[in-house]
Amino acid sequence: MEVAIALREQPEIRELFEVLEGNGLKKERQEVESLVNYLEGMESQFGEVIKELKEVRGQLEQIQDRGIKATAARLLDSAEGKVQEIGTQIAFVKTNLVRSAKNAVHDFKEKGVDALRRAVSAMKIPAALSALKESLHSGMESMERNAAKIGIVGGELNRAAQHTKNAGRALIGRRIKEPAEP
C-alpha cells in the first residue's frame, strides 16, 4: 500500500510556507496553515469513519431478518455515499491547494511579494474553510439521521423479539416478562 505524503510535507506547500515566512506575510501563512490543518484533520476523521462503516457493514451481515437487513443496508449505503462525497471534496481541495501553492510561488519568483500576496488572497481560504465546514456539517447531519433510523429499527426488532418470546410463554402458561425500555 502506497503511503501518501502529508499535505504539509508536500514540496509545494513547504515552499509556500518558506516564501510566506521569509517575506513577512504572517497572516497569509496562518491562513494557509489553518486550511492545511483543517484538511489534515478531516482526512484523519475520514479514515476513521470509513473504518467504522466497514465494521457496521460486517455487523449488518449478522442480521437475519431480510426486511430489516435491506432497510439497514439502504441506510448504510446512503451514509457511505455521503462519506465518499466528503472524501472527494477533501481530495479536490487538497489538489487545488497544492496547485495554488505552486502557482503562488511561481508568481512570487516572477513578480515579487505583491504577486504572492494577491495569489494567496485569490485562494479565498476563509471562504474555502467555511464551505468545507458547511458541507461536512450537512453530511454529518445526514449520517446522524441515518444512524438514528438504524438505532430505531434495531430497538423495534429487539422489542418484537421480546413480544414473540412473551407469546410463547403465554402459550405454555408461564408469566410474561415486561419489555425492557431502550
Predicted regions and their residues:
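Leu/Val/Ala/Ile-rich N-terminal alpha-helices, chiefly Sec-type signal peptides and the beginnings
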Residues: 1-84, 88-91
